[in-house]
C-alpha cells in the first residue's frame, strides 16, 4: 500500500470534498452571530447544542439524503435518513427524542417508499417521526430529516474539544455488510432486531455520563480519516493514526474501509488514563474498538504503518469544512 497515493485518494474522496462548501455557508450566518445567544454549540458539530435554561440541553440536527442514493432506492433513503440522524444525537452523548421530515416525490410510489423507509427506521429505533412537510408533485425525489435529542449539560460530547496527548479511538459495529446502493455504505442495522439496536445505541450515553471521552464524532461520509480530520480541524489540533491498529472486517478492501460510512461507527478521543475504559465500554456494547493513534500539537493529520508516514491533511493550508473553534 502506497501511503502517499492513499493520502491523496482520501483528500480527493467525494465524501471529503463535498464538505468544502460549508465554510462559505457558515460565513453568511456569521453576519447574524449576535442572535445565537442560546446556541452553546452550532455549526461544525454533529448536532447543535441549545441552552434551555436547566440541567438538560437540547440537541438539534438535520441530514439530507444524497440524490443519487435516493434515486437508487427511495425506501433505503427513508430508512437511512433515520439512521444518520440517530447517529448524530448518539455521537453527542444524547438521547434522541423525535424527528420531522421534508420530502419531495415525483410519484405516489416514490413518496410511499420514502415514508415506508422512514417508518421502518422508527420501528427499529423507537424514535418517532412526528410531522413534517411533503411536496407530492415535484419532478425529482428528495428527503431531509431533522431530529431533536436531549443530554445533560455537563455530558455533551463535542467535536472541538480534543487536546494534544489524547488518544484516538475508532469503534465500529463489525456485524455488517456493504450496503445495496453504495460501496461505501456499511449496513449494520437493517437486519437486526429493534431491541438489539436500541441497546447498542446506549453506549455513547454511558461514555458521556462517565465522561470517558474528550471529543468525538460519528464516522460519516468522509470515512474514518476524513471524520477524524473534521474533529482535528474544529479542535485546532493534529493527529497521528497507526493504520495497522484500525479495526477492519474481513473481505473488505482496506482503502474502501477507510472511506466507509458505517451504520454504527465512532471516532472518539480520550485522556490516556481513560482510553482503555472507553474502549472497554464500546466493546461491552458489541462494538469493536481500539486506540488507533494520538492527538498531536500542530495542524497535521498523519497516517503511518511499517512502510512510512505521510500527512493527509495540514490544516494550516488545507480544509475540510473550514470551521475552527474560537
Regions found by a protein language model. Name each.
Residues 269-276:
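Helix N-cap motif at beta-to-alpha junctions
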Residues 1-5, 9, 13, 285-326:
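Acidic, Ser/Thr/Pro-rich beta/coil linker or hinge segments at domain junctions
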Residues 180-196:
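Short, compositionally biased
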Amino acid at each position: 500500500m502506497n501511503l502517499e497515493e492513499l493520502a491523496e485518494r482520501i483528500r480527493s474522496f467525494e465524501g471529503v470534498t463535498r464538505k468544502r462548501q460549508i465554510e462559505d455557508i457558515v460565513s453568511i450566518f456569521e453576519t447574524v452571530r449576535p442572535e445565537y445567544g442560546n446556541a452553546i454549540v452550532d455549526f461544525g458539530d454533529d448536532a447543535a447544542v441549545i441552552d434551555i435554561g436547566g440541567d438538560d440541553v437540547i440537541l438539534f440536527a438535520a441530514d439530507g439524503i444524497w440524490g443519487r442514493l435516493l434515486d437508487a432506492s427511495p425506501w433505503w433513503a427513508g430508512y437511512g435518513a433515520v439512521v444518520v440522524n440517530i447517529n448524530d444525537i448518539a455521537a453527542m452523548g444524547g438521547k434522541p427524542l423525535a424527528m420531522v421530515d421534508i420530502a419531495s416525490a415525483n410519484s405516489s410510489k416514490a413518496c410511499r417508499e420514502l415514508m415506508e423507509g422512514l417508518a421502518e427506521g422508527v420501528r427499529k429505533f423507537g424514535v418517532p417521526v412526528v410531522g413534517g412537510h411533503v411536496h407530492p408533485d415535484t419532478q425529482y425525489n428528495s428527503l431531509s430529516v431533522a431530529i431533536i435529542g436531549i443530554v445533560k449539560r455537563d455530558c455533551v460530547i463535542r467535536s472541538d474539544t480534543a487536546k494534544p496527548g489524547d488518544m484516538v479511538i475508532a469503534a465500529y459495529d463489525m456485524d455488517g455488510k456493504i450496503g445495496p446502493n453504495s460501496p461505501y455504505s456499511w449496513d449494520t442495522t437493517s437486519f437486526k432486531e429493534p431491541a438489539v439496536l436500541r441497546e447498542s445505541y446506549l453506549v455513547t450515553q454511558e461514555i458521556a455520563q462517565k465522561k470517558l471521552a474528550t471529543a468525538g464524532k460519528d464516522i460519516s461520509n468522509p470515512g474514518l480519516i476524513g471524520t477524524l480530520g473534521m474533529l482535528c480541524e474544529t479542535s485546532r489540533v493534529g493527529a497521528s493514526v497507526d493504520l495497522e491498529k484500525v479495526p477492519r472486517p474481513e473481505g473488505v478492501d482496506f482503502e474502501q474501509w477507510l472511506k466507509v460510512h458505517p451504520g454504527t461507527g465512532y471516532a472518539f478521543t480520550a485522556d490516556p488514563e481513560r482510553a482503555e475504559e472507553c474502549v472497554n465500554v464500546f466493546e461491552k456494547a458489541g462494538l469493536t474498538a481500539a486506540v488507533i493513534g494520538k492527538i498531536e500539537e500542530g495542524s497535521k493529520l498523519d497516517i503511518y504503518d511499517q512502510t512510512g508516514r505521510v500527512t493527509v491533511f495540514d490544516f494550516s493550508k488545507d480544509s475540510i469544512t473550514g470551521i475552527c473553534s474560537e
